[in-house]
């Protein structure tokens, strides 16, 4: 179940990275970035955030390639010792649990607000948790195959909607480029943390790859695809709704879909399609974080995998129910992104340096 003998291909690893990153960001990123930049240059912030994510992912991949048959939970003890390694692993587990809880709660908010109005959050959350549990019980390979089905559906629907929204796109809403200078763009970069700090999954994936030497390739391609998705989203949303229109909307991505219709087609409103694919993407992010957390508990505390999965269910449920309203949900997301920035910004570099120093000393 958690054994690295169940291998995934480089293409599957790439698709896992893409699906892991593509979650709530498409729905909320235009607003969070534009609130910081207060200009139409948010797409540049996204581009810079993507570049930083590629660099961070490459460092994590290089570190994991030093121990290609072990996950981070196993090889961290070789780098910093057993107890400190376990402590860092517990921090990682907590992060994955918090991120998974955030994705589940966002999914609940979207379903309640747009699809099943009045449905209790606990009912939606419990349903998602049990389906997620079922999805990860057989290990990473079935998860990879599920993601292979989700990804092409996402691409087709997303690009179709993007093309159809060209009818309300106004290029002047994106001008002037860098009219307020570079500083607003740099302020916007930090708000991309939650959308891009997902290359940490390589701490887990490399041990399951058939060709660990291709880990960097998977990170570069995967993050590049996600960056393209987010840039297209930023450009289309700001171009259609304007800067002022974006910052006043909670879910500007969905509001864009509501802003146009094509008479004569069987389906004249398209936000339902976007909801479908992004509920799938939120679910995809949740199950891989659930899997990563369960894997960590199993390997750190030497427990049976299935017991860890069942044991973490109430933890995720409690965390996902803690936000009392929509604002609290976004605060949780900001908190998770800040934690990720501190953990995965500097720690991989430090561990890579220590690892190389130790191996050089052994020689």
Swiss-Prot record:
Subcellular location(s) per record: Cell membrane
GO biological process: amino acid transport; spore germination
Keywords: Amino-acid transport, Cell membrane, Germination, Membrane, Transmembrane, Transmembrane helix, Transport
Entry membrane topology: Multi-pass membrane protein
Pfam families xref list: Spore_permease
Membrane-crossing segments per the record: 8-28, 41-61, 84-104, 113-133, 149-169, 189-209, 218-238, 273-293, 305-325, 335-355
Principal place of residence: membrane
GO cellular component, as recorded: plasma membrane
Keyword Membrane appears in the UniProt entry: yes
Primary role: Involved in the germinative response to L-alanine. Could be an amino acid transporter.
UniProt record similarity statement: Belongs to the amino acid-polyamine-organocation (APC) superfamily. Spore germination protein (SGP) (TC 2.A.3.9) family.
This protein's name: Spore germination protein YndE
Gene: yndE
């Amino acid at each position: 179940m958690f054994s690295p003998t169940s291998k995934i291909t480089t293409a599957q690893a790439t698709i896992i990275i893409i699906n892991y990153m593509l979650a709530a960001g498409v729905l909320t990123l235009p607003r969070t970035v534009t609130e910081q930049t207060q200009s139409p240059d948010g797409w540049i912030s996204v581009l810079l955030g993507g570049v930083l994510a590629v660099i961070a992912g490459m460092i994590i991949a290089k570190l994991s390639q030093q121990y290609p048959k072990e996950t981070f939970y196993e090889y961290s003890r070789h780098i910093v010792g057993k107890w400190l390694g376990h402590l860092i692993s517990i921090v990682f587990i907590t992060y994955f649990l918090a991120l998974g809880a955030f994705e589940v709660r966002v999914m609940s908010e979207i379903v309640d607000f747009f699809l099943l109005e009045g449905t209790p959050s606990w009912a939606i959350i419990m349903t998602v948790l049990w389906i997620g549990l079922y999805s990860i019980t057989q290990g990473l390979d079935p998860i990879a195959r599920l993601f292979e089905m989700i990804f092409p559906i996402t691409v087709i629907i997303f690009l179709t909607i993007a093309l159809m929204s060209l009818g309300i796109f106004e290029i002047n809403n994106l001008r002037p480029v860098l009219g307020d200078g570079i500083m607003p763009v740099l302020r916007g970069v930090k708000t991309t943390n939650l959308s891009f700090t997902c290359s940490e999954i390589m701490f887990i994936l490399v041990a399951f790859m058939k060709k660990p030497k291709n880990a960097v390739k998977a990170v570069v391609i995967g993050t590049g695809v996600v960056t393209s998705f987010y840039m297209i989203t930023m450009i289309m949303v700001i171009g259609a709704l304007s800067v002022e229109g974006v910052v006043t909307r909670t879910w500007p991505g969905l509001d864009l879909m509501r802003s146009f219709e094509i008479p004569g087609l069987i389906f004249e409103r398209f936000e339902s399609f976007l909801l479908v694919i992004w509920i799938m993407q939120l679910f995809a992010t949740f199950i891989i974080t659930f899997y990563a957390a369960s894997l960590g508990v199993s390997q750190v505390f030497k427990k049976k995998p299935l017991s860890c999965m069942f044991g973490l269910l109430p933890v995720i449920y409690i965390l996902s129910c803690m936000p009392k309203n929509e604002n609290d949900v976004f605060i949780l997301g900001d908190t998770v992104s800040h934690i990720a920035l501190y953990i995965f910004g500097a720690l991989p570099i430090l561990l890579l340096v220590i690892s190389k120093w130790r191996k050089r000393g052994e020689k």
